[in-house]
């Protein structure tokens, strides 16, 4: 406990690479990277994006995150297949894949039970009550979903626009009372494409 780790944005689609990911990696304890998905419901494109992501990693951390929150196709099964294809490439290359999105977007666009059946405890879910500065979680909007590893509880955890997240699964516990006793946080900058950094304080 007491460590300061990071999850850093590296790529988006197959045409954008963060110009600051290497610098952010060198000045932090990076435990993961994430990719903003543009593949919708296309398996081949998802695989290409995963390979592009992996080929541009500044280091080899534990987690690789598929940020799936925009551009889903109208075919829920196709979207699910594409997400799994992306995660499969990450897994095949020795990483632990994580799925990031919002609960309503997830339920509307993918069969999340298929994702968690293959990759248990792999969800990073965003849900917050407003856009006010909230340094502490408001449990009234906790997105109750099985297999949630991280919960993003605000987009403005600090003035200046930083996300904050609670690590739900990290010590083998998944009960609210125990979560609050071992509260760990992720902070992710949202100041444009160049500023995406996640910081986890505590056990992951």
Task: List each model region and its residues.
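Functionally critical loop-and-helix segments that line ligand-binding/catalytic clefts
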Residues: 1-4, 114-183
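Substrate-binding cleft of extracellular glycoside hydrolase catalytic domains
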Residues: 1-99
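Short, solvent-exposed loop/turn elements at domain surfaces
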Residues: 15, 158-162, 196
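Conserved beta-strand termini and adjacent loop/short-helix elements that scaffold enzyme active sites
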Residues: 36, 100-102, 128, 153
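Generic detector of solvent-exposed, compositionally biased contiguous segments
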Residues: 61, 96-97, 177-185
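Beta-rich nucleic-acid/ligand-interaction surfaces
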Residues: 104-115
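Short, surface-exposed polybasic-aromatic patches that bind anionic ligands, especially phosphate groups
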Residues: 179-204
């Amino acid at each position: 406990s007491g460590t300061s780790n990071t999850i850093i944005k590296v790529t988006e689609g197959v045409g954008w690479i963060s110009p600051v990911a290497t610098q952010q990696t060198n000045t932090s304890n990076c435990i993961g990277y994430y990719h903003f998905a543009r593949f919708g419901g296309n398996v081949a494109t998802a695989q290409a994006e995963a390979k592009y992501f992996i080929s541009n990693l500044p280091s080899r951390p534990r987690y690789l995150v598929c940020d799936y929150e925009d551009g889903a196709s109208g075919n829920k099964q196709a979207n699910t297949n594409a997400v799994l294809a992306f995660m499969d490439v990450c897994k095949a290359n020795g990483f632990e894949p994580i799925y990031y999105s919002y609960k309503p977007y997830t339920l509307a666009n993918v069969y999340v039970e298929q994702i968690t059946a293959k990759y248990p405890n792999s969800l990073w879910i965003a849900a917050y009550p407003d856009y006010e500065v909230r340094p502490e979680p408001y449990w009234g909007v906790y997105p109750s979903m099985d297999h949630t590893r991280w919960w993003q509880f605000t987009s403005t955890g600090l003035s200046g626009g930083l996300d904050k997240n609670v690590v739900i699964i990290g010590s083998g516990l998944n009960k609210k009372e125990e979560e609050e006793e071992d509260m760990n946080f992720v902070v992710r900058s949202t100041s444009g494409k160049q500023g995406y950094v996640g910081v986890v304080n505590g056990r992951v």
